[in-house]
């Protein structure tokens, strides 16, 4: 194991450079927010009422709301861990097709998670709004924390989708280059000559004239005729 000898060498190491990437920082925030959402409702999300020992969800006694938050938070946390592991191997991926497929999968999942967290935020906030006040002695702070970090998860997943889209644009497969021109995606390639394309070739023969010969100066193309000298008669 290599131990850095100075702070400059530590800052230039691969591990630090990997942690400083915007994609890595975003994934860390996604994992932390997901962990807060599902742990808050998993520990304090189920409480019993004063007149009954049976546990109920603190979000309007709707067990679906608590189950949704716990399940979505846990799956999102696992997704962040899996993509962090794949990001560490991104530089070792040699195949262009596999790398493009990985980036496309990252973009699709980021968009899906942004939609899931948006729907979850609306659902949890609605259930909390219809919850009777002071029905449960504990758990109100956990419910508010889960709803707040559900909203924050929407923002980080949208930013993750934006980063994945930028990677797709910058790492387009060769020989294609993708440019965003006034909202439209343009694909440009270098044209290759085909067998049916007309090619101007000089023809040979006694009756053929080339462009180069026609472009010569009149002095070279039209030689002067010899002059006849008149001799005096003695």
Swiss-Prot record:
Location of the protein in the cell: Membrane
TM region(s), chain numbering: 25-45, 66-86, 104-124, 145-165
UniProtKB keywords: Membrane, Transmembrane, Transmembrane helix
GO-annotated cellular components: neuromuscular junction; synaptic vesicle membrane
Topology with respect to the bilayer: Multi-pass membrane protein
Chief localization: membrane
Every MARVEL domain range: 18-169
Pfam families with a match to the protein in the record: MARVEL
Xref: PROSITE patterns: MARVEL
Family to which this protein belongs: Belongs to the synaptogyrin family.
The protein's name in its UniProt record: Synaptogyrin-4
């Amino acid at each position: 194991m290599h131990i850095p000898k100075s702070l400059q060498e530590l800052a230039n190491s691969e591990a630090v450079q990997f942690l400083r990437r915007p994609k890595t920082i975003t994934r860390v925030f996604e994992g932390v927010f997901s962990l807060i959402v599902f742990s808050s409702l998993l520990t304090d999300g189920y409480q019993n009422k004063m007149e009954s020992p049976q546990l109920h969800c603190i979000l309007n006694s709707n067990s679906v709301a608590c189950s949704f938050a716990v399940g979505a938070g846990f799956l999102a946390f696992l997704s962040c861990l899996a993509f962090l592991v794949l990001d560490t191997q991104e530089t070792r991926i040699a195949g262009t097709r596999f790398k493009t497929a990985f980036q496309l999968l990252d973009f699709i999942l980021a968009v899906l998670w942004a939609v899931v967290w948006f729907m979850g935020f609306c659902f949890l906030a609605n259930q909390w709004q219809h919850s009777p006040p002071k029905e449960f002695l504990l758990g109100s702070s956990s419910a508010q924390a889960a709803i707040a970090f559900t909203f924050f998860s929407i923002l980080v997943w949208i930013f993750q989708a934006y980063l994945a889209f930028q990677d797709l644009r910058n790492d387009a497969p060769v020989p294609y280059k993708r440019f965003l021109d006034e909202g439209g995606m343009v694909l440009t390639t270098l044209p290759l000559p085909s067998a049916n394309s007309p090619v101007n070739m000089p023809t040979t023969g006694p009756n053929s004239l080339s462009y180069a010969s026609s472009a010569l100066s009149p002095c070279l193309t039209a030689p002067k005729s010899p002059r006849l000298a008149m001799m005096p008669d003695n």
